[in-house]
Amino acid sequence: MKRVENHDIPGLHGPIPARIYWPDGPQADGPLPVLVHFHGSGFVVLGLEGHYNVCRELCEGAGCIVVAVNYRKAPENKFPKPTDDAWAATKWVVENCAELGGDVNRIAVCGYSAGGCLATVVAQRAAVEGGPKIVFQLLVYPVTVMSDDTESYRRFADGYNLTADLMRWFIRLYLNSE
């Protein structure tokens, strides 16, 4: 690892904490691909520390800059604040790509669970709004449906650590207007 730095990204709802990872070695020459990373959280828990090792591995293994985004969490920050943070962070990466040492033509988004939802939203919004160009999505067990009326919810409701009841709780905190 060449270096790791914490940074605050300007956002619609205030600063967004981020951690930026730069790789070391021969692949670190020239403009590098950039991966905007959204950690898993159920929209409620965890932060930059929870995916520190994952981000390091992605950075070193892929030879890319990783910008890990600590988006706002529910219940204090309900939808759409986390999606606003994800969009603002991605746009900031594009606007500051050269300064970071990145290649604006090789921007990817990545997310785990709730972070996968945010990565999906960013990619869809970029497509609808005509940019920024997202060349790749790495979605790891993304939350893509907010309804629990599916065969998957019934079939895997219990016994897999993340239960249907816990998912309902996360989504209720994220979407409920109370």
Question: Which residue ranges define each predicted feature?
Answer:
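Alpha/beta-hydrolase superfamily serine-hydrolase fold, recognizing
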Residues: 3-178
